[in-house]
């Protein structure tokens, strides 16, 4: 099916492929399985993204990395490698990575899917904090009704290819 849509001011239907990097800089992505580079420490994982998106000034890069690590509560973990972190810490690095370019929108795909309930709640509190304090919109996909009921927000449910806005969720 076809339709019209825009994301953070970019019309998607006939978007010039040259504009995609600019759209991408306005989006942050949080993955279910973290997608961290295992051969780099936390700091270098974040630095890789900044370099890939055009950052050149070393001082600004360091400031930004310190800022996002502080926002997600990992200021002292920059030297650690992903395998040295808990699942919750790895997900916080993933959230930090999503924040690097100060996005207008974060797309979170099952951000609590690989986490225990307590750690899931910590990540949800972090995402709510980011949305409230920084004005970043967050669209999250989840099938976890516990998360939906514990952290109420505007909920959209899909069924048979259609979006149902503000659907009542029955547990």
Give residue spans per PLM region.
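Conserved ABC ATPase signature
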Residues: 81-85, 89
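Hydrophobic anchor residue at the start of the ABC signature
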Residues: 95
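Short coil-to-helix segment of the ABC ATPase nucleotide-binding domain corresponding to the Q-loop/switch region
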Residues: 40-48
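Conserved catalytic motifs of ABC-family nucleotide-binding domains
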Residues: 102
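Conserved ABC transporter NBD signature motif
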Residues: 2-11
